[in-house]
């Protein structure tokens, strides 16, 4: 497995973060050190120019910005072998637009945080994504222990179109003084049986990501119900 970033030290830092996560599992006796060593040995951190030439599947997880993703794939398109499958981990952006101009089809392969524990993968086909690519990504998802759910291309797909507006509404409730952060989170945990309150979840996801998703939903639909709470812009 190639783990790539725009700087070598960032890629190595990514592997270090993975190693720390596995160390916690070993400490809790949920995984053996031998298995962890084998997993870490299979991960090579580096730059895409050096490591992506022979990949069979590339999953992009760049910042949730259309131009950043388009530029990343345009660069990869010059490096990767023709049969390599391109997949984006975008949480809300158009697969068709991201893939426009590439010499190969693109597919959405949206994992959920934390990816090592969350079972779902949203599989999103763009206008030019062939059935064979969809089937291949579903099969790969199952092989790595995930449950693939195919969704049609639409802003936010399924989970984030439901989840992030809830977080946004919680921010409005805080802004309007209906309750404080602790009260809002406690109400949803105890009253709706959510494992995590919406504002705590927003922090976990990243408020910048929540804002980016709300902006995509609003810009794509023009529906005022997706207007981002001003608190998310602070």
Regions of interest found by a model, annotated:
Residues 131-135, 142-153, 171-234:
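NAD(P)-dependent Rossmann-like dehydrogenase/reductase catalytic/cofactor-binding core
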Residues 52, 85-153, 157-161:
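Rossmann-fold dinucleotide-binding core
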């Amino acid at each position: 497995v190639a783990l790539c970033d725009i700087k070598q030290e960032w890629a190595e830092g990514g592997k270090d973060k993975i190693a720390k996560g596995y160390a916690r599992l070993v400490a809790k006796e949920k995984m053996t050190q031998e298995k962890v060593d084998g997993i870490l040995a299979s991960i090579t951190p580096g730059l895409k120019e050096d490591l992506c030439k022979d990949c069979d599947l590339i999953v992009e997880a760049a910042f949730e910005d259309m131009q950043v993703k388009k530029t990343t794939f345009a660069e990869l398109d010059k490096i990767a072998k023709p049969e390599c499958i391109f997949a984006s981990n975008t949480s809300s952006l158009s697969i068709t637009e991201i893939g426009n101009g590439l010499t190969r089809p693109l597919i959405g392969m949206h994992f959920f945080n934390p990816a090592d524990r969350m079972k779902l993968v949203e599989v999103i086909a763009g206008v030019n994504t062939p059935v064979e690519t969809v089937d291949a990504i579903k099969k790969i998802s199952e092989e790595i222990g995930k449950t693939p759910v195919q969704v049609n291309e639409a802003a936010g797909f399924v989970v984030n179109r439901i989840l992030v507006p809830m977080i946004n509404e919680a921010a409005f409730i805080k802004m309007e003084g209906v309750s404080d952060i602790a009260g809002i989170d406690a109400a949803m945990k105890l009253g709706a049986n959510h494992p995590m309150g919406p504002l705590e979840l927003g922090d976990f996801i990243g408020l910048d990501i929540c804002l980016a998703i709300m902006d995509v939903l609003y810009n794509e639909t023009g529906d005022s119900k997706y207007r981002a709470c001003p608190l998310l812009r602070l």
